[in-house]
Regions:
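Secondary-structure transition motif
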Residues: 1-186
Length: 186
């Protein structure tokens, strides 16, 4: 069974993954406690090294990609019919607008988990903050697709981002996280 992973769209993190600008993600550990040793903790992580995971997106965005792909390559029927059939089948489902309800097997884009480590949230390095999608421009750092407030260091921008995509206070509480590195497969 294929698993899926969700990224925050409000801050364009799904897009950042698809463009190769985000190659790392942190997920809170359940119960915020590592299980004593690495082997025990690793058994309970959501994703394993080498695992291929689908990138969650809504059926509507999958349909839009199909139409864009057909237009770009000047495809005509039966591919246009396939897109229309897809739309008819899924546009009245919960997954049309909400990627949480989309079947992982239908998702067209995937990542491969290349590394995982367990650490406190604030142990993130400057380099890893950049891999989380923080953008560098000139001598400043910014949240993904938001150039309204510059930060001096990538970690500073990441601290703000994590409180926006999670809940306010996540950075300050410094929870245990699984830090997954990944590469885009398709």
């Amino acid at each position: 069974m294929t698993k899926k992973i969700l990224f925050n769209d409000k801050y364009s993190l799904t897009q950042e993954v698809r463009y190769g600008n985000k190659t790392m993600t942190r997920r809170l550990l359940r119960d915020n406690v590592p299980l004593g040793n690495w082997e025990e903790t690793a058994k309970h992580l959501s994703y394993k090294v080498g695992e291929v995971v689908a990138i969650a997106q809504s059926y509507k965005s999958i349909y839009a990609e199909m139409i864009e792909d057909f237009a770009k390559h000047n495809y005509h029927t039966p591919r246009e019919d396939a897109a229309e059939n897809f739309r008819k089948e899924y546009e009245n489902t919960a997954g049309w607008n909400n990627k949480m309800f989309v079947k992982a097997a239908l998702l067209p884009h995937h990542i491969r988990i290349t590394d995982v480590k367990v650490e406190r949230l604030q142990e993130i390095s400057e380099e890893d903050a950049l891999r989380e999608g923080i953008e560098e421009f000139c001598f400043d750092y910014f949240l993904p697709n938001d150039y309204s407030k510059p930060f001096l260091m990538p970690r500073d921008a990441f601290a703000v981002l994590i409180d926006k995509v999670g809940k306010k206070g996540d950075w300050e509480s410094n929870p245990w996280v699984a830090a997954y590195s990944f590469e885009l497969v398709d």
